[in-house]
Amino acid sequence: MARYLGPKLKLSRREGTDLFLKSGVRAIDSKCKIEQPPGQHGARKPRLSDYGVQLREKQKVRRIYGVLERQFRNYYKEAARLKGNTGENLLQLLEGRLDNVVYRMGFGATRAESRQLVSHKAIMVNGRVVNIASYQVTPNDVVSIREKAKKQSRVRASLELAEQREKPTWLEVDAAKMEGVFKRIPERTDLSADINEHLIVELYSK
């Protein structure tokens, strides 16, 4: 499947937010103004239509979680099929992805790095190696780092970095053992207020 391999900062500038969490890993060059649109002089943002606003929000969320368009649409279809609020269901499905859980637990500094740990077979779920980033973690699942991967400096550095972040209440992590428990599905109030999932629902409902 196709995956964007271009400059990630360019996408962050397009969406006006740090999509790939780079600022939490290293200082971003002062010349690279995230709040300024791409282009040498930061082209002025055009006034967006309702559709444009909805599309931008969908693209932002899709890029935050590192999901391709077809896969994102499938997540939406599944969210709409489930009982409850479709937008909230969508975010919960994205939060339940193994690569995201690995990031939330602090084993990877970014979701991209966490996805790499999963694909390189460094992650176990309930004692079994899982190398599928989209694997859905469910309540009470135990996610851990494989023994041979525990020595990786990037994993230790990520855990140190995670100490500076707010700890998710729906997870329980033992940094010394490099393992964590997915205690429950996060509620909407647990997640970022910077995401407007209602715009995505409006977009796909057309």
From Swiss-Prot:
Part of the 30S ribosomal subunit. Contacts protein S5. The interaction surface between S4 and S5 is involved in control of translational fidelity. The lineage of its organism: Bacteria, Pseudomonadati, Pseudomonadota, Gammaproteobacteria, Enterobacterales. The keyword RNA-binding applies. This is Small ribosomal subunit protein uS4. Belongs to the universal ribosomal protein uS4 family. GO terms for molecular function: rRNA binding; structural constituent of ribosome. It comes from Sodalis glossinidius (strain morsitans). It comes from the Bacteria. GO terms for biological process: ribosomal small subunit biogenesis; translation.
